[in-house]
Amino acid sequence: MLYDFERTAPEPQGLGLVPMVVEQSGRGERAYDIYSRLLKERVIFLVGPVNDATANLIVAQMLFLESENPDKDIYLYINSPGGSVSAGLAIYDTMQFIKPDVSTLCIGQAASMGAFLLTAGAKGKRYCLPNSRVMIHQPLGGFQGQASDIEIHAKEILYLKARLNGMLAKHTGQSLEVIDRDTDRDNFMSAEDSVKYGLVDKVLTSRNEAGN
């Protein structure tokens, strides 16, 4: 049973027409789709809902980049409304597991599990663009079945809530009591408010400010 942060997170519809980049070399031309070309620069995109498919792709890309160079940072760009808790935790655990620092950057929005992954980046390397929006809240879910089964799943979602709030407290520096209160309902923040709260470290207005 998957518990979703996002009430109406749809299945990904794809990114539409993907531009191609042609590189010239001594051995001729080589064409890449734009995302594969950016992967060479250690840039990964989390765009749209967080689900098993997107999680598997992101985990695979992080593991590949670690094998390529375990001492060089990875850059995770996030524009997501949130989604599956289990899929998001697969990404989270991999971010903490691999050797390279994962720098996170919110472009557009990072809501619910998107916000959780944003704040899970390496300390000092978590960023927002000026007009980004960040939203945190408690996990959501529903289950139908026998009363005993509903009780089991209710206990599980309460366990996940406590677990996720504890991790948010760790990454933001807020107390568990503050996190419990502030995630009780949808809690939207501007980029500047996200810095004050500890979800990110800095608002970037130009690439030079990242220090990368």
Swiss-Prot record:
Compartment(s) where it occurs, according to its Swiss-Prot or TrEMBL record: Cytoplasm
Catalytic activity: Hydrolysis of proteins to small peptides in the presence of ATP and magnesium. alpha-casein is the usual test substrate. In the absence of ATP, only oligopeptides shorter than five residues are hydrolyzed (such as succinyl-Leu-Tyr-|-NHMec, and Leu-Tyr-Leu-|-Tyr-Trp, in which cleavage of the -Tyr-|-Leu- and -Tyr-|-Trp bonds also occurs)
Residue positions of the active site: 112 (nucleophile), 137
Keyword Cytoplasm on entry: yes
GO molecular function annotation: ATP-dependent peptidase activity; ATPase binding; serine-type endopeptidase activity
A GO cellular-component term linked to this record: endopeptidase Clp complex
Chain's role: Cleaves peptides in various proteins in a process that requires ATP hydrolysis. Has a chymotrypsin-like activity. Plays a major role in the degradation of misfolded proteins.
Full protein name: ATP-dependent Clp protease proteolytic subunit
Native organism: Thiobacillus denitrificans (strain ATCC 25259 / T1)
Gene it is expressed from: clpP
